[in-house]
């Protein structure tokens, strides 16, 4: 069954945005270097396979192999560092990859069909980038909320400790500081 371009692109973007939000376990430096080499070798192999195609099909093939390489590098970087910032970069790389390939596919069309295709592709790209940005902002908001909750809980504990005197108060404050990360 052949789906219209807009439906295909929407499905790709939806699939792309289902990113694991949990922090991944990091990989060793040796695995990271091996991954970089593997990605580079895979890219060279896929790129050379594109020579069998002609005209825009070759351009699409080259763009797909380049897109796969960029996404793989971003995912590898996230696997190595496990930073939320790198997870965001994975989302951006995927959005950019889908956009670049879809834009290249639009070159097969002509006239108004091509213009519509390019506009739809650009709109999908902008939406995907907005979703990545929103995910990043939600993560930051959760972090801020957790910090606010921890600070509020610390103030409550400190207030309870104020009712004590002497060593009991000092021990209580030390325990509260340790518990709520105020060391």
Label each region the model flagged.
Residues 1-11:
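Bacterial N-terminal signal peptides that target proteins for export
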Residues 3-4, 23-183:
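Mitochondrial intermembrane space
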Residues 15-17:
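Repetitive helical segments and hydrophobic/amphipathic motifs
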Residues 19-21:
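N-terminal signal peptide c-region/cleavage motif recognized by signal peptidases
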């Amino acid at each position: 069954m052949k789906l219209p371009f807009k439906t295909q692109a929407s499905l790709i973007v939806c699939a792309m945005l289902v990113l694991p939000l949990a922090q991944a376990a990091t990989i060793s430096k040796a695995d990271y270097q091996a991954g970089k080499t593997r990605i580079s070798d895979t890219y060279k192999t896929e790129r050379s396979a594109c020579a069998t195609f002609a005209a825009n099909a070759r351009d699409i093939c080259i763009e797909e192999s380049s897109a796969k390489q960029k996404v793989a590098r971003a995912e590898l970087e996230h696997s190595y560092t496990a930073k939320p910032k790198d997870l965001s970069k994975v989302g951006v790389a995927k959005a950019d990859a889908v956009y670049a390939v879809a834009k290249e596919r639009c070159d097969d069309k002509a006239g108004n069909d091509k213009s519509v295709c390019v506009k739809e592709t650009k709109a999908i790209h902008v939406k995907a980038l907005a979703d990545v940005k929103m995910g990043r902002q939600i993560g930051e908001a959760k972090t801020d909320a957790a910090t606010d909750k921890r600070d509020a809980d610390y103030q409550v504990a400190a207030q309870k400790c104020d009712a004590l005197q002497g060593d009991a108060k000092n021990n209580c404050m030390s325990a509260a500081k340790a518990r709520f990360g105020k060391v």
